[in-house]
Amino acid sequence: MRLLIATIALALTSNLELNAQEAQINWLSIAEVTEAQKNEPRKVMMDVYTKWCGPCKMMMANTFTNEGLIEYVNKNYYCVKLDAEHPDPITFRGEEYTNPNYNPNSKGRNGVHQLSIALKVSAYPTIVYFDEEFNVIAPISGYKQPRQLQVLLTFFHDQFNSKTPQEEMQPLWDKYSSEFVGTW
């Protein structure tokens, strides 16, 4: 009887672990997003991180594993991870960006990728939000908990319009964020 109970418990635990492993953000490369935009335009969320960044690791473990967030971004956004110290060239909007100061022998921080600089990333983690044509909406730095990210994601998805004058966006954001009730 104990063996039967242990076997059932193990099977249930394995199934729960399998389900937890399946729920994850569908991270794409910039090239994959560029291609996907042709058939199904969406806004883009780009997580710019480094391997040595503690808050970046915390976001990966605590924020990007939230089931509500995963479901929302996989449905409404294309998601990209960009290592800001990545050594390889990246083509973005027809231009090639490199990391000319990358040192493969470096044990710690390394050269900053030109794409990270072009996107005005000055701290890690930074999430850069883009419209459907890969135009930057805003780079927003700092560790974000799921609810903090939810208000940004839903605002940019539901309220942002590139034709809205900048002076009208701040009052719109202030009102939206003050009335926002998170569900994650």
Residue spans for each PLM region:
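Bacterial Sec-dependent N-terminal signal peptides
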Residues: 1-22
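Non-globular targeting/processing and membrane-anchoring segments
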Residues: 21-23, 120, 131, 137-184
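Structural micro-motif
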Residues: 43, 98-105, 113-128
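Solvent-exposed loop/turn segments at secondary-structure junctions
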Residues: 50-55, 63, 84-89, 134-135
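A short beta-strand-turn-helix
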Residues: 25-43, 73
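Typically the conserved alpha-helix immediately C-terminal to a functionally engaged Cys/Sec
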Residues: 57-74
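Thiol-based oxidoreductase modules, predominantly thioredoxin-like and allied folds used
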Residues: 25-27, 69-107
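Short active-site neighborhood of thiol/selenol oxidoreductases, capturing the structured segment around
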Residues: 40-54, 79
